[in-house]
């Protein structure tokens, strides 16, 4: 679970909540939680529409890992919790080192469009061999096509990924949306009593 925002309640939202009975507060927080869930999911859809940085075919990372794993988890009379159950999104948020999985020594980073989203061991590119450079201290998976080398993947023991400040929507925008929704809900609740 990602812990990106701890408390999005503005002083105005807190003042609105104080006016309500516990059951009404819980109902209000449930609606604000759903609003927050919608806003975060919309942010992930927007990020997905940007495509990927290398220009390779889309993997729909932001939809698959972000939007599909975001949900309102818990609501009480005092809190509403929206969670994003994705280690990949957590890694985007915090950054860090990516290493190969168990039993693997290297990550294979695609260098060509036809290699993107394909595992080298899948066998979809025939004639692959490892080419090493002692001078550069790196290795590649390549093919020999008509006497010319064609590089498909760069092999590396790890990759350092910087934290992405755009992983989650801007906090000020979320607070403004939640405050507006709280005002709307307060008017609706007051109109019912």
Q: Model-predicted segments: where are they?
A:
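Short, Lys/Arg-rich flexible segments
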Residues: 1-193
């Amino acid at each position: 679970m990602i812990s990106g925002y701890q408390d999005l309640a503005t002083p105005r939202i807190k003042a609105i909540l104080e006016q309500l009975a516990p059951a009404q507060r819980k109902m209000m927080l449930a609606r604000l939680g759903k609003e927050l869930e919608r806003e975060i999911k919309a942010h992930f859809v927007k990020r997905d529409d940007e495509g990927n940085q290398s220009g390779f075919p889309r993997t729909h990372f932001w939809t698959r890992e972000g939007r599909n794993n975001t949900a309102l988890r818990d609501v009480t009379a005092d809190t509403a919790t929206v969670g994003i159950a994705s280690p990949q999104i957590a890694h985007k948020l915090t950054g860090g080192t990516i290493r190969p999985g168990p039993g693997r020594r290297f990550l294979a980073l695609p260098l060509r469009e036809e290699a993107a989203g394909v595992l080298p061991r899948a066998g979809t590119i025939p004639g692959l061999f490892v080419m090493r450079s002692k001078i550069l201290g790196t290795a590649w998976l390549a093919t020999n096509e008509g006497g010319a080398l064609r590089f498909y993947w760069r092999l590396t023991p790890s990759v350092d990924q910087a934290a992405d400040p755009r992983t989650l929507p801007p906090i000020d925008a979320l607070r403004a949306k939640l405050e507006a929704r709280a005002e709307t809900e307060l008017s609706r609740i007051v109109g019912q009593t």
